[in-house]
Amino acid sequence: MLKKIFLGLSLALTVLISFLMKITLWKEIWIPIVLFIGIYIGVVILYFFIIWLLSLTIDTKKEYDKPNKFYAWLVVITMEMLSNYARAKVKVTGMEKIPTNQKYMLVFNHRSKFDPIIQSYILRKSNLVHISKPSNFKAPIAGPFIKRSCYLSIDRDNARNG
């Protein structure tokens, strides 16, 4: 979704700038192409800059008991965008087996650091409580967002905490 918005915005700005520059010759056709790529990269950088600014507004020392829907939504759409940019091909089967009328616990075995991003995006409509290692809560941009989305911190090295 976000990728399509960025592409549409970049295309609209490219067309507008090309129209204002009055590009009419075929030998100048490279200008809109370079403009489109530059504007697209600029829009993505602007998005992450805004995300960074929003992360500064979150009090990481405070304990939250309910996740904020806005910040949880930002986490989900950013995960979607990262999955799309990584060109991750995901085939999901068995979603109908996930219970909808009772509480349950899912334990994911992941081989890479990217797997939880995809898993969280795929199960975004489920009312899940996510767990994460304590070092993820200290990450500069993602840390405040996962804290405000009420992820649980579990130290895997300490058996008593796990």
Protein language model features and the residues they cover:
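Soluble catalytic domains of membrane acyltransferases
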Residues: 84-162
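Membrane-anchoring hydrophobic helices of lipid-metabolizing enzymes
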Residues: 2-14, 18, 22-103
